[in-house]
């Protein structure tokens, strides 16, 4: 059994397969996932697990060089934005329109669906390198 924090086999496999500039997305329960994008559904009920719980877990193993967030989170969910900023530290953020984020999911290695039920709780993580 793994000793690391990510024990979900599908998430672990995607992280292991990530290369430089590859993307992985995490989102709320309502985010539409394009056909062809791998969906890893970890939601079990409203709010469980939360977006922040899943993001924290994935950040424990994935080297992230940049994140993408929807512009709309600034006004529609500032509490979630503050929580994300606290987790990612100095990692650069690029704000994009929510419609663009939905399109960019086509390029993601996978989308992890959480039980989050707050608006614009979605992120695209761009993989960095550890050297």
UniProtKB/Swiss-Prot annotation:
Location, primary (coarse class): cytoplasm
Pathway(s) per entry: Carbohydrate metabolism; D-ribose degradation; D-ribose 5-phosphate from beta-D-ribopyranose: step 1/2
EC number: 5.4.99.62
UniProt-recorded Gene Ontology molecular function terms: D-ribose pyranase activity; intramolecular lyase activity; monosaccharide binding
Alphabetic keyword roster: Carbohydrate metabolism, Cytoplasm, Isomerase
InterPro entries named among the record's database cross-references: D-ribose_pyranase (IPR023064), RbsD-like_sf (IPR023750), RbsD_FucU (IPR007721)
Entry annotated with the keyword Cytoplasm: yes
Cited SUPFAM superfamilies: RbsD-like (SSF102546)
NCBIfam families, per the entry: PRK11797.1 (NF008761)
Protein name: D-ribose pyranase
Organism for this UniProt entry: Latilactobacillus sakei subsp. sakei (strain 23K) (Lactobacillus sakei subsp. sakei)
């Amino acid at each position: 059994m793994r000793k690391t924090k990510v024990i979900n086999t599908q998430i672990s496999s995607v992280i292991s397969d990530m290369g430089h500039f590859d993307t992985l997305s995490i989102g709320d329960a309502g985010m539409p996932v394009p056909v062809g994008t791998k969906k890893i559904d970890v939601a079990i009920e409203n709010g469980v697990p939360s977006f922040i719980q899943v993001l924290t877990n994935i950040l424990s193993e994935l080297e992230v060089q940049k994140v993408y967030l929807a512009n709309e989170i600034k006004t529609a969910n500032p509490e979630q934005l503050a929580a994300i900023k606290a987790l990612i530290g100095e990692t650069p953020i690029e704000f994009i329109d929510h419609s663009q984020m939905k399109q960019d999911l086509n390029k993601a290695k996978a989308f992890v669906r959480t039980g989050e039920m707050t608006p614009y709780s979605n992120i695209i993580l761009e993989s960095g390198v550890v050297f």
